[in-house]
A protein has these predicted regions:
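Acidic, low-complexity, intrinsically disordered interaction modules
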Residues: 31-90
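An N-terminal amphipathic alpha-helical segment
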Residues: 1-50
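Short acidic DE-rich linear segments
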Residues: 93-94
Length: 94
């Protein structure tokens, strides 16, 4: 499923990610999902990184889409643990 971030140039996407660690951490989780054939996973992110997630997923999709996969995410409402939000990451074959 396409979203408004899919057609933004990669350099613009990367410039909009304030916390580069969340990008690296999310990419690591996505990679582990493929290795273990797990296509969804819960993942905790700092509350201040919430705004970055659309850009993080768009950047990851630039890398994995040519290999037949697409990542997405969904926020789990009202799940806040010590200032971290729980999100649900998805990895779909396309």
């Amino acid at each position: 499923m396409a979203n408004k971030y899919d057609n933004i140039p990669l350099n613009v996407i990367l410039d909009n990610i304030k916390d580069k660690d969340i990008f690296a951490n999310t990419a690591e989780v996505i990679c582990s999902m493929r290795e273990t054939v797990t296509f969804s996973k819960f993942f905790y992110i700092p509350a201040n990184c919430f705004r970055d997630m659309n850009y993080v997923i768009a950047a990851i999709n630039y890398i994995i889409t040519p290999f037949g996969y697409k990542a997405s995410w969904n926020w789990l409402h009202d799940v806040d643990v010590s200032g971290n939000y729980c999100i649900h990451l998805f990895l779909d074959e396309i």
